[in-house]
Regions:
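Long, charged alpha-helical interface segments
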Residues: 23-46, 50, 54-62, 98-185
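Short, acidic/turn-prone active-site loops that include or flank metal/cofactor-
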Residues: 13-18, 48, 67-71
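Phosphate/ribose-phosphate-bearing ligand recognition and processing surfaces
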Residues: 90-100
């Protein structure tokens, strides 16, 4: 049972709520450096976990996890790798969502001078990000983005703001030997 792994913090959510049998949810405010330091974290999410397994099934060679808080670390890593990149968005239950598309656009904005962009979805993501860049939170709020509506209904506006804030976590989770570990650019 994942909820009983000795010495590990077990966490996860299903549909925006702490998953049954786990200790914690996926709010960034549950994981202060002093709380999580030197501990393993076992995390499952409604959409991200599924995307990770999908990437593995498709034979992805190099998997990282990314979000606005680690945007610069992600961009630096992608530029340093100098390989073709596929940005795979976790979405929400097989449906496109605004915040994932905004993040893909932000990555494209940071790496576009180093890569050729040859996909309309990338062009659209970058255009959306360019429009939203002045205030990402207000953009998703004003557009009544589905994730915004769902999470704000739970009182998680602070989490949304945190997750849309670029470069506040200089960490790069890299998938190696069956788990995500801290990587470097």
């Amino acid at each position: 049972e994942i909820g009983n792994i000795p010495g590990a913090v077990t966490a996860g959510e299903r549909d925006g709520r702490i998953a049954e049998g786990l200790q914690h949810g996926n709010s960034p405010f549950e994981y202060s450096p002093t709380f999580i330091e030197n501990k393993g974290l076992v995390l499952t999410t409604t959409n991200g976990t599924r995307l990770l397994y999908m990437a593995l099934e498709k034979g992805a060679q190099n998997i990282i996890t990314a979000s606005f808080p680690n945007l610069s670390a992600v961009a630096a890593y992608l530029i340093a790798q100098n390989q073709n990149v596929l940005l795979a968005c976790a979405a929400w239950k097989d449906r496109v969502n605004i915040e994932d598309t905004l993040f893909a656009g932000a990555v494209i904005d940071r790496v576009k001078e180093h890569f050729s962009i040859n996909c309309d979805s990338s062009v659209m993501a970058h255009a959306l990000y360019t429009a939203a860049r002045p205030d990402l939170y207000e953009f998703v709020k004003n557009k009544k983005a589905s994730h915004y509506l769902r999470l704000s209904a739970y009182g998680l506006e602070k989490d949304i703001q945190y997750c849309l804030t670029p470069d506040i976590a200089n960490v790069l989770p890299v998938y190696k030997e069956g788990k995500l570990v801290t990587g470097t650019a």
